[in-house]
């Protein structure tokens, strides 16, 4: 997957876990990705939108992977501004993405397809208690849509992941890859 090379930047501190996740996804022939919390980008000089590498750039990477495998990325964010920015960054892959402006809990409850790869990254981790509780609720809703080979990638290790990790482990998932920022689980 040579397309990943362009995302390997010094500031993309999450690249290694995304690369590992997508390589496993390819081996497992995954086509359906669900992402809560879309890549925001950032504004420079009030009008120029550009990548925010510290965000990890999940949405463009997942979108390009979806194109590569003829799959679909379903990404939701409560902010219409974030969705608008993500649409600009991913315009070359628009056929392979569905955007949802919705709270992640509502979105996940209404999502009725099996999920191959679940990426939980909604709600900023500045308030670890609220973020952890929210991610746990996402996990509790999404688990029914996962299958035996599904992957779960949790972002903001140590803040948002505090409760969801234990929930997934109690439901027979195991940590298969871990960095300072993210945790990848599978059965």
Regions found by a protein language model. Name each.
Residues 1-187:
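A short alpha-helical cap/connector motif
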